[in-house]
Amino acid sequence: MDEFHRYGKEDSSWQQCFLYPLFFQEDLYAISHDHYLDGSSSSEPMEHFSFNDQLSFLTVKRLIGRIREQNHSIGLFVNCDPNPLVDRNKSSYFESVLEGLTLVLEVPFSTRSKYSVQGIKEWKSFRSIHSIFPFLEEKFPHSNYILDTRIPYSIHPEFLVRTFRRWIQDAPSLHPLRSVLYEYRNSPENLQRSIIVAPRVNTRFFLFLWNHYAYECESILVPLLKRSFQSRSSSHGSFPERTLFDRKIKHIIRISHRNSLKSIWFLKDPKIHYVRYGERSIIAIKGTHLLVKKCRYYLPIFRQCYFHLWSEPYRVCSHQLSKNCSSFPGYSLGVRMKPLLVRTKMPGELFITDLITDEFYPIVPIVSIIGLLAREKFCDISGRPISKLAWTSLTDDDILDRFDRIWRNFFHYYSGSFGRDGLYRIKYILSLSCAKTLACKHKSTIRVVRKELGPELFKKSFSKEREFDSPAFSSKAVARSQRERIWHSDIPQINPLANSWQKIQDLKIKNLFDQ
């Protein structure tokens, strides 16, 4: 497989023309089996897989023979496995095909993504959770509306096959993909014309399908929106007056051509800011209410015409930039004005000008977090800490580690938000709930637990400065962290609050449209 990767880097056409023979190699399924074992031991467990611990090469040989005999009238999994077809999620055949198919298609897809990102310099796609933080730090000098969109889950399997066919020259390699998709669509639990792909489906194959599907959606839509908004008008920068405006703009752009090409991009404002994580994306644009309303109607029509998808109206919402405009993802986002002092020195005179720019103001949604902690039995609905009775059978170290892990995840995720009062309240709830859990386990009081286990117990687990124990962080860095916003880049996955809170918000919006 390493040799296949090496040849693919040298010649991308080689990997597109010779993918189908890989399905007849027994080593492919051994590699896919190892990939499954590695994925099951990672931080994102694959709950839907039940792959056998020992790989049966007899099963692999039967599978390869079935692929050779495959045609349009014969299913890939019919009468091939001793397990019933209804329990296909536990079938070793089905899991082997999913893992092997994903492993083969990931190689040209990764190469295509790398070349496309290098080729398109005017647009950088944001597809990682770490891209949320630069977006929250970004300034919005001219944007006045936000489009909150959600990519539809349901998609016809033939469309996925055709999108792969655009950039894979080896057409026979897509036959197993078509068989897998149609077998999944025709299953008893999924009898419908389309299949469901979503980022929350915790399998390697469907996560790969979702990433490819979302990549196709945004790689076409976002550059189209950028060109549309750039062609409307040029930004007037920070000129305080409008006298002879067109002449000044032409003069500056002509000078920029002679001096530096980068100055053109400084003057021309793209008027659009885009970020996506999972199925939800935010687009900050500049325009009138009528223009934003047209965009709301354009996005569903665009998906319907190009991707053959029907999107519910509530999946595209618009908000005006205001104090509390949106929530993404797990943050309560507001917009505040940030003044910038500019000094302009001219011969004999000095001008001082205040420029006002808008920036996001993310705060901790303490009410929603308390509701989440109440559902998990850490506190009641009013935020009063209670003992976690389900953990009383664990050891003291396990209880402390679990509470510490929860607090560390909250601290990492919301460390860059404005206002730490919400974080301190979460820390108080978790620390007191931990103390009550230990007291309930030992059948004593909180005071006795503190006295027996020592005063350093909770200080070690819930220390505020424990994130800066590394020698790379000096005392000045710790002091600066109390004043400035610091985003932690070691977040393994999105906070569970984001998904639970977003479900509530989607339900509220859907109810408004149904009324």
From Swiss-Prot:
Biological-process GO terms, alphabetical: mRNA processing; RNA splicing; tRNA processing
UniProt superkingdom: Eukaryota
Pfam families the UniProt entry points to: Intron_maturas2 (PF01348), MatK_N (PF01824)
Molecular function in Gene Ontology: RNA binding
Major localisation: plastid
Keyword Electron transport set for record: no
Database matches in InterPro entries: Domain_X (IPR024937), Maturase_MatK (IPR002866), Maturase_MatK_N (IPR024942)
Record's GO cellular component terms: chloroplast
Keywords: Chloroplast, mRNA processing, Plastid, RNA-binding, tRNA processing
KW Aminoacyl-tRNA synthetase (keyword) present: no
Subcellular location: Plastid, Chloroplast
HAMAP family referenced in this protein's UniProt entry, alphabetically: MatK
Task of the protein: Usually encoded in the trnK tRNA gene intron. Probably assists in splicing its own and other chloroplast group II introns.
Family, as annotated: Belongs to the intron maturase 2 family. MatK subfamily.
Name of the protein in question: Maturase K
